[in-house]
């Protein structure tokens, strides 16, 4: 009987790997990628925040900030803990209520939190668990119970990560949405205490939802699958034809490198990379290309004086010999093509902003402010990392029912240097959200192209339809001019000459900015002011992401987000009010060096493939256990045949001026 899931544990799964216990309830199985996702009432949630905080204080549950949780995770790398402790560390990313892990093997409670007797019992019990850690027997039957159920699998213990994997079960009745803030801390903390008291390991409860496709694009196919290590739903992205050409190899390596560095509430992060089934594939694949060149060189050096009549038969025999050797060593050509697919696991969200916009549900002005604030907040994180997204659109903005938004899809993203504007392709950004300089063939552009896209999305949220919906690039440019007026020569300094002449031939046209007030009945002066600054024709005059975040229109959105939605702010048991982070809109901790892009451009296909392979193999697997594709899964046939978007499904190409 074929198993139901696409992912399974890798064949070389370590027998002593430990997995965290996962206690699931009906309220924890939330959301799927569907257009019916209902958003929380932000105003009601904000009004109930104070009473909920008081409830937390009465229960005496410790809450710690994010940076202490990070320190706890670092300490965990040095000390193997009981699976229930691992569960607390993983869950701590979303619920800041767990005891701090010291660098000593013992689990020490925080001194600044009033502790209940249950916490002292937990402390003593965890100490006993750590002392008995080396004496526990490995659960060798776990792979037999779980391995056949999942699409991916794991190998050996390593680092512990945190996930944000939510998906609705369409077979279950939808729960009334509640913002997952401090009131849920009591429930999760009690579950953690009960889990720590269990003397025996319990395997994670598998999600019963079937694996299914949830989206595809020009560079990949995304499936919703179950991670057998945790039982959670995650997104599996399949990127085919990685080594088809040098440009494709660079794009995939760039995307994986970026996703691995993201740690932000509003940017999708990488959970894991599936290691190749054949670890020596890259070396064997390289030999396919190198060996013929060596044989050909030797052949040519020996057959120069020989008649051409003998050349073709010898070459044919040589090629036949190569393929026989590859078959003899178990490396078939078709198998090599199969291995050019790269699989990555990311967080799974419930829906995206496009589905929310076209749905019949109500979008209040509070929702608009919170969404726009989060888009700009995530964009600041990317721009400070020297990354241009170059495809900001509602479909690439994932949303959960709690209104958390994450920027995704970095297939077109690349690093850049603000001090040295290099030529880049203008075939980026979906047409409806493409900045005018890109429409006019500019090759040197900045992060202002992302800012323009945010302005288009802002207007789309207000009026619930696309702002500039044109059939082609020329009509798109004309719609922009109809709104903003004819640009000056200075505003078109990055455009190509053909585009400039086209605009000037049309004659001058006055701006029509007053039409922005008709986007919605709730459009205010502040909203129009921010829109106008986001939609400046001249990219040098367009507002920066930092300036946009400080705009008065987004003050309420910032307050709502950091009152009950973010992970950077926290609440202490002995402090009645929420403690806000000093950096509400954080920057990237380690920006990409612009030299990295230049160095990568000098690499050959073989060198780049070697670097990519080394990066994948050196990266520790999530939970310390690697995964692989399960060919026995019932969904494997459909998964293997799923392909990227065809040329006819893609947006029109930019105008060739």
Swiss-Prot record:
Cellular component GO terms, alphabetical: cell cortex; cytoplasm; nucleus
Superkingdom classification of source: Eukaryota
Residues binding ATP: 214-222, 237
Record flagged with keyword Cytoplasm: yes
CDD domains: STKc_NLK
GO biological process: intracellular signal transduction; Wnt signaling pathway
Positions of the Protein kinase domain: 208-554
Pfam families cross-referenced by the UniProt entry: Pkinase (PF00069)
SUPFAM superfamilies hit by this protein: Protein kinase-like (PK-like) (SSF56112)
Oligomeric form and interacting partners: Component of the beta-catenin-lit-1 complex (also called the lit-1/wrm-1 complex or the wrm-1/lit-1 kinase complex) at least composed of lit-1 and wrm-1. Interacts with wrm-1 (via N-terminus); the interaction is direct and activates lit-1 kinase activity which leads to the phosphorylation of pop-1. This promotes pop-1 interaction with par-5 and translocation of pop-1 from the nucleus to the cytoplasm. Interacts with pop-1 (when phosphorylated on 'Ser-125'); the interaction is dependent on the beta-catenin-lit-1 complex.
Family statement drawn from the similarity comment of this UniProt entry: Belongs to the protein kinase superfamily. Ser/Thr protein kinase family.
Function summary: Has a role in the Wnt signaling pathway controlling the asymmetry of cell divisions during embryogenesis. Operates in the AB and EMS cell lineages influencing cell specification. Required for body wall muscle development, endoderm development, pop-1 asymmetry and T-cell division asymmetry. Component of the beta-catenin-lit-1 complex which promotes the phosphorylation, down-regulation and subcellular relocation of pop-1. Regulates plp-1 nuclear localization in embryos. Plays a role in male tail tip morphogenesis.
Protein name (record): Serine/threonine kinase NLK
Organism: Caenorhabditis briggsae
Lineage: Eukaryota, Metazoa, Ecdysozoa, Nematoda, Chromadorea
